UniProtKB/Swiss-Prot annotation:
Protein name: Serine hydroxymethyltransferase
Residues binding (6S)-5,6,7,8-tetrahydrofolate, per UniProt: 132, 136-138
Organism for this UniProt entry: Methylobacterium sp. (strain 4-46)
Record's keyword annotation contains Transferase: yes
Pathway recorded for this protein: One-carbon metabolism; tetrahydrofolate interconversion; Amino-acid biosynthesis; glycine biosynthesis; glycine from L-serine: step 1/1
Amino acid sequence: MSAGTAKTPLSNSFFSASLADVDPELSRAVQQELGRQQHEIELIASENIVSRAVLEAQGSVLTNKYAEGYPGRRYYGGCEFVDIAENLAIERAKRLFGCDFANVQPNSGSQANQAVFMATMQPGDTFLGLDLAAGGHLTHGAPPNVSGKWFKPVSYTVRREDQRIDMEQVAKLAEEHKPKVIIAGGSGYPRHWDFAKFREIADSVGAVFFVDMAHFAGLVAGGVHPSPFPHAHVVTTTTHKTLRGPRGGMVLTNDEALAKKINSAVFPGLQGGPLMHVIAGKAVAFGEALSPDFKIYAKQVVENAKALADTIISGGFDITTGGTDNHLMLVDMRPKNLTGKAAEAALSRAGITCNKNGVPFDPQKPTVTSGIRLGTPAATSRGFGVAEFKKVGELIVTVLDGLARAGEAGDGAAEKKVLEEVHALTDRFPIYA
């Protein structure tokens, strides 16, 4: 065989061998994770289950393509087809949220937030955000985060008596500190936000009003949650969670001048080449979210959350704010003298996945907490309705009551029985079968 026709050692299998053939160890971990998702009830509020179409787009050959820049203005050749993917994502995002500009390149919600900070502030500038301990997010000024290191965060909180946003405090802090930016949004607040009032306060001090709707974007898209537009100057979101797309971020605005600053902040300010396979997955998910079926899904997410909250309250637990308007709730363990850490572990043993979470004015350490956070997006995606979520609420109460009786090791018999019922439920609503 001549040198010109010689084959490399990889050529026979490199493009055809499966993951199981090439890397059995990793393949086994993937299959185990698939089994976990299939047979456990996922109640982590920030997680969801994507369609097979999203998985296919994200696992496509678009992962091979470098595409620094923006559609039609790339720094590499050969981008004509990935431009189609990104333009589809942009146009669908704009339709979905009724805005004029969308940047779909951020690799995460955190990077989307960083881009907004870069576009609207200088290091050392002051901004207002919800305290992490009251349901805010790390990127809204927590001391370990870059937002707390490079800028001067001032935190507003919730009222002790009803755990709702203290808008009088927001107005007072804005007047006192004259922030450049005011943020609405968080990771543990179960009620609607008064976007109009926030904008009024922002206008009174000349601040940019920034909404981080990472948790409830899918509910906005589905028409069951108030939209931050037209009140917000700029909006960020993740593309997973309630929006049910691949893990990633996005920035939206109606302000052309601000959009240009955001584009520059994303690239070249924070990122180089965007992840085109993920952007393709975003395009697919946004297309799905434009369908009538998604509106039905979003409505069901909220109805399921209310049913779950009501059932848990009936079981003797407190829900922060007394209920929920969206997809999530914080369950206060203190009426049963439990910690969030112990509750998370007990529920995990029973096949129910959630996360420990602080509650407002929590006396426990962040690594222990007095609460757990529950959400309905993932189990709703697999087909659970109100009846199933009432049952899930009853199962949660059974496990936690057993924990209260037996101590930190939990009630093994109760947990085993609940695990069997969890498997019966998940078998009725299979995923990726």
